């Protein structure tokens, strides 16, 4: 499981950096675990360069049994929906004209139980689109309507990946609603936007990353199954969001160093965090191509012969939609700011852009990866 966690973490960082390059000052949010699960399912049906490229981009070199690893992580995470408003939906739709081989169907059946579906894009496009939209809406408890837009698919679509993920967290320690105030959020050195700022004084795991003058904090959600880790620059020092230095230094190794529990310690913290909701529809295709998935999306070079005898088949599209909501909600309310319990306090004031991950603590896999630049 460790090898898979490291692979997923490396892929998450690679894709995050690609998305940052394409949208330097925008909010970013995606679910690396959803994408890597879907691409690993597609990989089962590929051969040759296509299979090798997926393996390289997803960093599977040292991972022994990829499908089984994902099965374990997925079932662990899905159990959490009884504690949180959390859903990760991952689907691979294959046009029935491809007549997927029985070998492919049987080898994916157990590890990717309900993630594979054969549909009819060619002759029943509108009906299929309607079915996928209503199925995703139902699976996400109504969070995502019409995940497929007009131009997401066509009657030429052969293979389609659809990811839909949302999370509405409940904290281990509730933020007192009476302490939420409107404050300026500094989107750059010179500009601000108003934001509802939540405030709490409590003990959290805190660390300093001195070489990039940042702080990192771990905020556990109820039952500690998930945590939000936030990397916050001490100030906005560059001419953009203040995150340039972190983004340059960020790689799979530095992320592991920064989030290593041994570099963090419990501290009494005066915490200020924006209340926010981010919903993103990302098109990861160009970013994945830049990372090295050269043949997967190209009909003349992709090799899906492990799935179908049909020639000229490629992955037609990747739809990836995610929603994250951060509010005061949580467990027992604890000391209200202003009470004299905490004498010496560290401040963690997220009133300027920050990078965050939502981590599954049991497997230490990254469920969501994002940056918050503007309310």
UniProtKB/Swiss-Prot annotation:
Transmembrane segments: none annotated. Keywords: Glycoprotein, Secreted. GO terms for cellular component: cornified envelope; cytoplasm; extracellular space; sarcoplasm. The keyword Ligase does not apply. GO terms for biological process: extracellular matrix organization; morphogenesis of an epithelium; prostate gland morphogenesis; regulation of epithelial cell proliferation. GO terms for molecular function: serine-type endopeptidase inhibitor activity. The keyword Secreted applies. Coiled coil: none annotated. The record marks 340-341 as: Reactive bond homolog. Glycans are attached at residues 133, 298, 361. It is found in: Secreted, Extracellular space. Belongs to the serpin family. Ov-serpin subfamily. Tumor suppressor. It blocks the growth, invasion, and metastatic properties of mammary tumors. As it does not undergo the S (stressed) to R (relaxed) conformational transition characteristic of active serpins, it exhibits no serine protease inhibitory activity. Interacts with IRF6. This is Serpin B5. The lineage of its organism: Eukaryota, Metazoa, Chordata, Craniata, Vertebrata.
